[in-house]
Amino acid sequence: MKESIIIKNFGPLKEVEIDDIKPLTVFIGKSAGGKSIIMKVIVLMRYIYKMVNIRSYLKNAKITRSPFKLRFNSLLHDGLKGMITAQTEIYYTVEINGNKYTLKYTNRGLQSDINIPDKDLIFFKEAYVSGMRSLIPIWASKAVSVKGENLGFFFHETFNDFNDATDVIKEQKLEYLNLKMKVRKSGNRPKLFTIESLQNDAVPIELRYASSGIQTSAPLVAIVHYFAQEFSFKDAFQRSR
């Protein structure tokens, strides 16, 4: 599978073309230059492409009535809607088995009416890790008292991914620090996250009281571990149908 994307006139992005989105792609540039916007647009288009694959799967199975509709504007969150203009263009292309499939957003409209044969169908999980992830420890410790509060779509998506991860992962090693994060749950109380040493009997501390670096990195490591080793594509596919 090969991905490419062209983005024109989207917020601070005047024209961006990435011919091959690699598994590890690093963006380097000045602050507020639009790096996070690029990633949000890629995640958005990947999500739409995933849903097009599901729709194609159902259509190929002779289920002609789609259980969902793709409305581009309803998928724009955290200020992205205000970055769209009449001049905005997005072209997202996936090449698989020598065949190319392109989603387009032009003239304020999404063009996603493509059908993908069974041999080219793919299903994946896209995840955007919010830059506000350092707030996860304090948010998790006050999960009940802050119910209904809103820190933005992408933060809550990241927090939900972390919450799902720590439903499964009860001990996450942070070997680069000789530490581990332990997860405990008791009744209806919020989960308790503690940081403990891998080598000695140092007194454990709650994640929310750990250093800023640990507060930022521990949730990220847990999320990556979850999607790499514990995530169930079968369950996710059934939820998406």
Which residues does each PLM region occupy?
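Short, proline-centered helix/strand-breaking motifs
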Residues: 22-26, 130, 241
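Phosphate-coordinating catalytic segments in nucleotide- and nucleic-acid-processing enzymes
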Residues: 6, 46-240
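Pre-Walker A-like glycine/lysine-rich segment at the N-terminus of P-loop NTPase domains
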Residues: 1-43
